[in-house]
């Protein structure tokens, strides 16, 4: 396992003799015994000149250390709701090393969360994430208020965050109880995110903390405290440090062009439209997944928790939150099986080493696997309770129906930069299909073709390796599979629950072919894969079967390409999703939309680097 991987350990709590929730890990209380709500307002809001500083702003970003019970977030949210002059959008980025489980938070909400904040806490509880390491984006007020929870050790998390922060709430357990959180190096790595005029506030006035904040580039003052605090500390970014600060970005006022209307383009367009942007989607085909009955969205695990596993985990979580309530998406669960007993044992060992929560993934023996599937299966494996069965084209149609999205039929052949930084998207005849300052190429294997014709591919050797890979699935009558499995069964191939009386079985990989089409040879390979998962041949299936064939855009390493072209302002890529278009769709859309709109990014910087265009 990678030495960088650290399992996420939930909070261990108890209620002390005074009735306050305390951490057994650190021996300190979560909330101020005097007045937790009042301290949140006096120290963190007023200490950062809030709400005055967000007035007249399109968006405002806060970064917090020590989420705990969410008291500071809830107080900030309440102040925003009550302020008629509030900013358009409010973002909080909060780091928590030992989060409470959903059950633990629910158990203490009515006794430990201050009464004025409990209504907000119940909304927070409804979105409480699975306790998985990484970033979790929660949205409130129809997306106008976002909370990005960064779960993990602050020493690992802080260097991987990307944001332009207006105010810091430095909370958490006392420096004497949890010195690692107040380490000078950690503070420096965190406070680098501050804008040129960023402020900070904290309830502690410990000398080494104040010195660390000064070393991190802040002018520090110790002020008289209140509500049980003798002194508090506030600060403003020093002029010398502000020269190196990240620059604020406001959302584009003009429309954004998205080239491609498949899973990549639809996810991108929806993410932009949700933020109030106008989007023009240009695509040749109105039904790129027509006839594709169903597909599976499942995470994956790797013993070293590598970039692909982390991205798949983040993508599946993002999709689940973004697509809830859509008719095209159904949570059915997913079994992941290996091809033999030896590989199964290795998979079980991997799961044990990673310490993921059982409500996200757990090991099941063959008997339980059969109960979950409702069919005989070859062996036990991993069970992901949140596995999603998706009808791809209805999902795409639902995403592209979002207000603010305009669809245009046409095939973009090249991009041309014209005056004032505008990009024109031209077809093969030179006709202008759209014009914008920001263009996202989300057209799968067509991406390198457009870049090459535009003179932009040369500096991108990785993108130049992108190619199309054919594949097909077979549609098996559900009656031939006892009505079909109750959950998705995957491994080397997959068998999906019935949709409209058919079970999708797949899939093939056919490199080097000129045409992707349904074939008897492909059907045979798919049925063989299904037999390997179910432990027996599909004898009830006879004759040619219907199916669906398409193309995957893939690159070496099986990772997508995501981000702005280096040195080329306004051209973005969201492509090479391969077999995991459902995994990357919502996440990639949010990453690029967040970058365009100046939000904290919902993905760690090392993962962004792994999928960058260069």
UniProtKB/Swiss-Prot annotation:
Region tRNA (mnm(5)s(2)U34)-methyltransferase: start-end pairs: 1-238
Any one of the GO CC terms: cytoplasm
Matching InterPro entries: FAD-dep_OxRdtase, FAD/NAD-bd_sf, MnmC-like_methylTransf, SAM-dependent_MTases_sf, tRNA_MAMT_biosynth_bifunc_MnmC, tRNA_MNMC2, tRNA_S-uridine_synth_MnmC_C
Enzyme Commission number(s) of this protein: 2.1.1.61, 1.5.-.-
Keyword Cytoplasm assigned: yes
One annotated GO molecular function: flavin adenine dinucleotide binding
Major subcellular location class: cytoplasm
Keywords assigned: Cytoplasm, FAD, Flavoprotein, Methyltransferase, Multifunctional enzyme, Oxidoreductase, S-adenosyl-L-methionine, Transferase, tRNA processing
Catalyzed chemical reaction(s): 5-aminomethyl-2-thiouridine(34) in tRNA + S-adenosyl-L-methionine = 5-methylaminomethyl-2-thiouridine(34) in tRNA + S-adenosyl-L-homocysteine + H(+)
Residues covered by region (FAD-dependent cmnm(5)s(2)U34 oxidoreductase): 259-614
Cofactor: FAD
Subcellular location, record wording: Cytoplasm
Pfam family name, one: DAO
GO annotation, biological process: methylation; tRNA wobble base modification
Highest rank taxon of the organism: Bacteria
Biological function: Catalyzes the last two steps in the biosynthesis of 5-methylaminomethyl-2-thiouridine (mnm(5)s(2)U) at the wobble position (U34) in tRNA. Catalyzes the FAD-dependent demodification of cmnm(5)s(2)U34 to nm(5)s(2)U34, followed by the transfer of a methyl group from S-adenosyl-L-methionine to nm(5)s(2)U34, to form mnm(5)s(2)U34.
Family according to the record: In the N-terminal section; belongs to the methyltransferase superfamily. tRNA (mnm(5)s(2)U34)-methyltransferase family.
NCBIfam families, per database record: MnmC_Cterm (TIGR03197), tRNA_MNMC2 (NF033855)
Identification of the protein by name: tRNA 5-methylaminomethyl-2-thiouridine biosynthesis bifunctional protein MnmC
Protein species of origin: Bordetella avium (strain 197N)
